[in-house]
Regions:
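Fe-S-dependent hydro-lyases/dehydratases of central metabolism
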Residues: 1-190
Length: 190
């Protein structure tokens, strides 16, 4: 998955290296961060935002990448578009230049937030070099008390592990509490 903020540089690197998008049918783009909430009409009041959407459109048109554009009815927040459009499935690997990419883990996907150079590598090869992650399973049993929600659960876990507790790990969440969570609650945790 790609969006307008982290992909332009990756497409530029591809051009500089005379590389093409290897599998455009496996890459999906949406305009996300720059879309005004009060109106989605173009041109946007912000000229930089307008330029960013035009550049993403051009990059997708030139490379054959599927673009969920504003008028398509499929455009939205990049870490929500994947599940909404059926792209995110159990067992798939989802990578995106967005810190909320881990949200896809709620659907049983391996979800990786990556940088611009890794976006370039994925576009060019559909592969990327990764250090082997350790796996940490978090098991939460019992019932949540009234007024305790998914956000409270994950904040408690983060408090126990520390803000760097996830570095170098892939997390599995298990137990009665997670089993009973809705998909929205699981997305909150991931």
């Amino acid at each position: 998955l790609i969006h307008e903020v982290t992909s332009p540089q990756a497409f530029g690197m591809l051009r500089d290296l005379n590389l093409k998008v290897a599998y455009p049918h496996r890459t999906f783009a949406t305009v996300d961060h720059i879309v005004p909430t009060d109106t989605r009409l173009e041109p946007f009041a912000d000229p930089l935002a307008d330029a960013m959407i035009r550049e993403l459109r051009t990059n997708c048109e030139e490379t054959g990448v599927t673009f969920f554009d504003l008028p398509s009815g499929k455009q939205g927040i990049v870490h929500v578009v994947g599940p909404e459009q059926g792209i995110t499935q159990p067992g798939t690997t989802i990578a995106c230049g967005d810190s909320h990419t881990s949200t896809h883990g709620a659907f049983g996907a391996i979800a990786l937030g990556i940088g611009t150079t890794q976006i370039r590598d994925l576009l060019a090869t559909q592969t990327m070099a990764l250090a082997k992650l350790k796996v940490r399973r978090i098991n939460v049993t019992g019932k949540l008390r009234p007024g305790v929600y998914a956000k409270d659960v994950i904040l408690h876990i983060i408090r126990q592990l520390g803000v760097k507790g996830g570095t170098g790990y892939a997390y599995e969440y298990a137990g009665e509490v997670f089993d009973e969570f809705s998909m929205e609650e699981r997305m909150t945790v991931c």
